């Protein structure tokens, strides 16, 4: 009888895992798409609702400083409908060196948008545009983007000649996820000797997958079944 109960509990776990993969998709790793989208798509077609904005400073040990503008919203239109959109902009206000990379960790994996898996995007705010006033117009675009499943890290790279230097800013860039926002610290890399990021900015990012907690609960339930049968 004990073996039968153990088999049933394992079957429940296996079924839950299968349903979880179906409902949420499987975690992904590798390059993100780094797709160029229009400002109109980002501000109108994707129909932003529940918009959240966070402007957070960063500082380096050599005195270089700036801000990260972070936006999260729930999309109700276009190809991203039903998903959360996360967008960032690097503003390098003062100091020497060249910003070469930006990453968010931990964050959940990027969603598939349309036929594009691991969807990420960048867009340039036109001069005079009034939407999302905390974002600056124009800027430097990332050359590539990626997601590391092991580290739960989304990253964007600004190599030569696309360095971000003093008084410059990046374009608006980000990714899309099925998961709601949380606030985490971001990392920034800069070329300038041994300068380190001493003041990390806070940004919005996709929160941890809730199904994992449910899976743990089912596992504990199964363990409880085993213990009760042994009494």
Model-found features: residue ranges?
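A short, hydrophobic C-terminal helix/tail in secreted or cell-surface proteins
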Residues: 208-227
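Extracellular or exported targeting regions of proteins
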Residues: 30-205
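Helix-centric, low-specificity signal for extended rod-like, repetitive segments
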Residues: 1, 13, 148, 220-222
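Sec-dependent N-terminal signal peptides
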Residues: 10-16, 216-219
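Bacterial N-terminal signal peptides that target proteins for export
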Residues: 2-12, 210
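C-terminal segment of classical bacterial N-terminal signal peptides
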Residues: 16-26, 226
